[in-house]
């Protein structure tokens, strides 16, 4: 609230419109893209095991928090583990190197984004492994992991600019 220059009540009201995770009492936001609740997308940073809602979320959090991270997520088509090492500046390692990320553009309001978009944003071992899935989701694009990171780097830079850590 202080950073945004908004009253606390208005900030909480805005956050309640987003698809966040709240504690059992409903008074504390505990997840908004990054969470302690297990998902397919394991996100390790500073030795802490966290999770992201979407494959795409995992790609930009290192930039937002200013720290390197390791992503581990299964290929949705084959179940094979994909591992990605990221820094705020770029992709350091991808295993397998052929891994791609599916991307969809939400046609929904922000409160529905997790349900509507995250299920369609996944990691795949390769474009070939994703071919059957993509045939069922023609609206989705497949991008190599490094290309997705660079795309997010530009977007994050435009949105947050010099407010980013580091």
Give the residues covered by each predicted segment:
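Aromatic- and glycine-enriched beta-alpha-beta binding-site module
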Residues: 30-81
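Intrinsically disordered, low-complexity segments enriched in polar/charged residues with Gly/Pro
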Residues: 7, 27-30, 58-60, 110
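Residue-identity detector for threonine
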Residues: 11, 27, 35, 39, ...
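A short, conserved structural fragment
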Residues: 16-27
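Intrinsically disordered, low-complexity regions
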Residues: 6, 27, 32-34, 48, ...
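Long, low-complexity, charge-rich intrinsically disordered regions
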Residues: 70, 80-166
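Residue-level detector of family-conserved "landmark" positions at structurally sensitive sites
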Residues: 9-11, 25, 72
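Short amphipathic alpha-helical interaction segments
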Residues: 3-18
């Amino acid at each position: 609230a202080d950073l945004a220059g908004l009253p606390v009540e208005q900030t909480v009201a805005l956050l309640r419109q987003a698809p966040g995770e709240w504690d059992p009492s409903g008074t504390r936001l505990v997840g908004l893209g990054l969470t302690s609740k297990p998902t397919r997308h394991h996100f390790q940073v500073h030795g802490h095991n966290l999770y992201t809602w979407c494959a795409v979320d995992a790609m930009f959090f290192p930039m937002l928090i200013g720290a390197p991270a390791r992503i581990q997520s299964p290929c949705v088509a084959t179940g094979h583990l994909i591992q990605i090492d990221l820094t705020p500046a770029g992709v350091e390692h991808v295993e397998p190197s052929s891994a791609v990320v599916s991307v969809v553009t939400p046609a929904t309001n922000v409160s529905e984004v997790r349900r509507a978009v995250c299920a369609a944003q996944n990691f795949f071992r390769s474009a070939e492994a994703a071919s059957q899935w993509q045939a069922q989701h023609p609206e989705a694009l497949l991008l190599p992991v490094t290309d997705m990171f660079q795309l997010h780097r530009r977007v994050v830079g435009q949105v947050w600019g010099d407010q980013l850590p580091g």
